[in-house]
Amino acid sequence: MRSRIQRLLALSAVVTLGAVLLVVGLAAAASGQTRHVRWDIISLVGGAPPGPINPGGMASAKAPDGTMITLTGSGTFVAPGGNNGGSHAVTGGGTWQTFDAAGASTGSGTYEVTELVSFEFANFQSPTPAFVDNIADVNKRANGTAVLRIQFADGSQGVLTVGCHGPGAPPGIFEGIATTKGFKTYYDVQPPAAGVDANRTIFHILR
């Protein structure tokens, strides 16, 4: 009798362990899936909902000495599943312009994305407020943060961070861009302002 009870207890433990491992495995698979993503520095017409949301916007960030960089840009990347890994499956780029502390232009050109360093998907954006989305499926808008390695046409290199804090985003994500260009750190993200068409970004999960 005791032997039978022991066998039943052992079987119950095995079944419980199997169920736990199955749940953990499913959660890991869900959080570690490969994502095909489009990113954009957007134009939000009127600087408020419903927009529309168009490609071709601009966003700025400042360096500690008061100088500023303004970027346009868009592209795609494939974010591999698991461990927030990087990828060379990237496209896109944009334009850049730098300004001194007084606001005078000091240079301009283009840049190209060469690598995805990391992408952290936060969540899909909430359906309200409603937007007209002229880029991709409005229901596939996403919040999160992408870190991209970029090559400037003047020979300098940089690391571009694109943050999207749209409707329904959890706290802690900035909205806009931050980048390096050579040794210079343009890390003072210029936030969007209501009614102003600037300093906004978006991700779309393509699949």
Annotate each language-model stretch with its function.
Residues R2-V15:
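Bacterial N-terminal signal peptides that target proteins for export
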Residues L8, G25-A29:
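Alpha-helical segments embedded in low-complexity/disordered contexts
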Residues S12-V24:
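Bacterial N-terminal signal peptides
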Residues A28-S105, Y186-R207:
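N-terminal segment immediately downstream of the Sec signal-peptide cleavage site
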Residues A61-T161:
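Predominantly extracellular/secreted and cell-surface proteins with exposed
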Residues G155-R207:
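A eukaryote-biased signal for long
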